[in-house]
């Protein structure tokens, strides 16, 4: 798939912007604070209905405007699909093929993107929350069911934590409601973890040969989904639900004492190993960056396998963070396969056939020229 055109209205520093794109590498050159990253973010928000930079949607709306609008036309195997996202201070509304989607979980997935920005290099060495968010965002764009289950899990988790806090402060003494909420929570916790386990297995399958190639065959990358549950090699949903029920039963007194849920996918993590050693703790910066790059490139094939089409790749100021060898490997991997958007302050020193054949745009003060 690829984006054929993009229109921004009152988005960040863009009053109005209309762009046409080719199904190739599109390089956006400009100094810092001119609008390069805002443009990349707009494509990502159009796809994911949320920003990778902020959780405050009001920041996406141009100063003194009531709403921002992002429109695009995506070309897929089965035809052309117009999509639109309107961001107001009251919320977001998305349209696919001119039809308004009742829920954003139904909207997400109309266009698939992979964002690789400098902060993604923290995927390995950052906090577990960073990796959980990575899982949720990437699984969500290929599985609307996952987004639905995750949303319900988070809603019930919030209700359960609120009730535990009431039990802790003795504003409530009857634990019947806790039993009801726990039963509901275990079902959706198990569904979320099952999908995450499946995704991590698939990601490892695609990331291993990429990592091996970058490391010239010297390193083997393995991934492990870390959860408080005992997970068998072939997990079963009903067994996982039972396991959660047993876990919450054992933790009940401690949870009431602390006023918070102490188990579930909101506390899980993904661990990365190179040649059997934990990369986060023992890996060099080079190994950590190779791991992050391998994971991002693996997503290209994983999404293609899931939906039958390649996603759109967004490389936001990330080339400058990679050495020449990793730059070359990245550009070689995407060559001729995926529509790619690259932002950079300069292409000087980046000598690769992919960039030489790219469409070049220049941005200054929120205005683009080619």
Curated annotation (Swiss-Prot):
Alphabetical list of Pfam families matching this protein: SMC_N
GO molecular function list: ATP binding; single-stranded DNA binding
GO biological process: DNA replication; DNA synthesis involved in DNA repair; double-strand break repair; SOS response
InterPro entries: DNA-binding_RecF, DNA-binding_RecF_CS, P-loop_NTPase, RecF/RecN/SMC_N, RecF_2
Keywords, ordered alphabetically: ATP-binding, Cytoplasm, DNA damage, DNA repair, DNA replication, DNA-binding, Nucleotide-binding, SOS response
Sites where the protein binds ATP: 30-37
SUPFAM superfamilies tied to this protein: P-loop containing nucleoside triphosphate hydrolases
Cytoplasm keyword on record: yes
Function: The RecF protein is involved in DNA metabolism; it is required for DNA replication and normal SOS inducibility. RecF binds preferentially to single-stranded, linear DNA. It also seems to bind ATP.
Record-stated family: Belongs to the RecF family.
Protein's name according to its UniProt entry: DNA replication and repair protein RecF
């Amino acid at each position: 798939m690829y984006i054929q055109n993009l229109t921004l209205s009152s988005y960040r520093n863009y009053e109005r912007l209309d762009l046409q794109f080719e199904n190739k590498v599109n390089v956006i050159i400009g100094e810092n604070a001119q609008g390069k990253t805002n443009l990349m973010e707009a494509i990502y928000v159009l796809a994911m209905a949320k920003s990778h930079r902020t959780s405050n949607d009001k920041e996406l709306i141009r100063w003194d405007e009531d709403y921002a609008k992002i429109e695009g036309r995506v070309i897929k195997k089965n035809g052309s699909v117009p999509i639109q996202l309107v961001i107001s201070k009251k919320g977001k509304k998305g349209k696919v093929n001119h039809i308004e989607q009742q829920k954003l979980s139904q909207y997400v997935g109309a266009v698939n993107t992979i964002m690789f920005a400098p902060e993604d290099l923290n995927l390995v060495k950052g906090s577990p929350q960073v990796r959980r968010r990575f899982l949720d965002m990437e699984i969500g764009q290929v599985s609307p069911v996952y987004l639905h289950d995750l949303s319900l899990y988070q809603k019930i988790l919030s209700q359960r934590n609120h009730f535990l806090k009431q039990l802790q402060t003795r504003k409530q003494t009857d634990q019947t409601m806790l039993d009801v909420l726990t039963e509901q929570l275990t079902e959706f916790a198990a569904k979320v973890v099952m999908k995450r386990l499946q995704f991590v297995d698939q990601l490892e399958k695609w990331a291993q040969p990429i990592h091996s190639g970058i490391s010239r065959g010297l390193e083997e990358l393995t991934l492990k989904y870390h959860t408080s549950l005992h997970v068998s090699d072939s997990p079963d949903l009903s067994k996982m639900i039972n396991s959660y029920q047993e876990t919450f039963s054992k933790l009940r007194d401690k949870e009431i004492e602390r006023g918070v849920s102490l188990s579930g996918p909101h506390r899980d993590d993904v661990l990365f190993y190179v040649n059997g050693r934990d990369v986060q703790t023992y890996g060099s910066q080079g190994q950590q960056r190779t791991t992050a790059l391998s994971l991002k490139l693996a997503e290209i094939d994983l999404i293609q396998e899931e939906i039958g089409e390649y996603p759109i790749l967004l490389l936001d100021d990330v080339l400058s963070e990679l050495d020449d060898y990793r730059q070359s490997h990245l550009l070689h991997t995407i060559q001729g396969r995926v529509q790619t958007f690259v932002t950079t302050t300069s292409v000087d020193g980046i000598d690769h056939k992919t960039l030489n054949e790219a469409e070049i745009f220049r941005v200054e003060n929120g205005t683009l020229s080619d």
